[in-house]
Amino acid sequence: MELKKKEQSIFVTRTSMPPYEEYVEMIKPLWDTHWLTNMGQYHQKLENELREYLQVEQLSLLVNGHMSLEMAIQAMEFPEGSEVITTPFTFVSTTHAIVRNRLKPVFCDIKPDDFTIDETKIENLITEKTVAIVPVHVYGNICNVESIEQIAKKHGLRVIYDAAHAFGETYKEYGIGCFGDASIFSFHATKVYNTIEGGAVASKSRKLYEKLYNLKNFGIKSENEIIDIGANAKMNEFAAIMGLCNLKYVAKNIQIRKKKVQLYNEQLAGISCLRTPRFDN
């Protein structure tokens, strides 16, 4: 009797892990220093390496992508009740970050081909209460950053990009984190690059970096001075080391992800009721 060959699943996303021995070797010094959190040497090293990799001027590491967005919005100090234009086609975290800052999300429709926010519909949603736009890059497809930033400049709005799906993406040779007033990244275990849990805020502003440095550490500026109502949103050293290890392999992992997307597109091409997103190279 011939046994039927077991079919193997092709996972679109599966947590990328560095070689076990490599990670273990890097965490050994922690048993000597006992410095496990509070912006230790590995936290600082990862900030520097990601700043270079993502081609951004400033980068602040945080405990996850959600807190990165929530604190980036908090740092802008918008008046309570102000409106923020965003997309409903995103993980719930995007909307939660707006609402938790006591702001009102205003949903803008998306484009059917790449699922990013439809920039042609943004201006009709702007009111006297609008203070910002939070566009979301989707599945590696980036928003129309040029049009969005023209609209923002015309109406005096801030732009905070949710770039959780856009690690390593570039536009006209600029890292995607260079656009807007800030861009947030997620390093969750499901992402193509992960620190187990983690996130970051990229920007051109040193002032924003320093503001986030305080906010993610309970608003503490010094032993005797608390200048903001912050929270504990610091990345720990074990997560930072995972990030340092995984950064060596992220280019390979991105290529693996691209091959899987190609395979899915090929296998689903004959199904008339399905349409996959358009991806620009």
Question: Which functions belong to the PLM regions below?
Answer:
Residues 41-49, 53-59, 120, 124, ...:
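PLP-dependent aminotransferase class I/II
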Residues 178-214, 237:
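Active-site PLP attachment segment
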Residues 74-163, 170:
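PLP-dependent aminotransferase-like
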Residues 161-195, 222-227:
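Conserved active-site segment immediately N-terminal to the catalytic lysine
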Residues 60, 85, 106, 159-160, ...:
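Structural detector of well-ordered beta-strand residues that form the stable sheet scaffold
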Residues 1-36:
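N-terminal "arm"/small-domain region of PLP-dependent enzymes with the aminotransferase-like
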Residues 35, 39-83, 97-109, 174:
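Phosphate-binding glycine-rich loop
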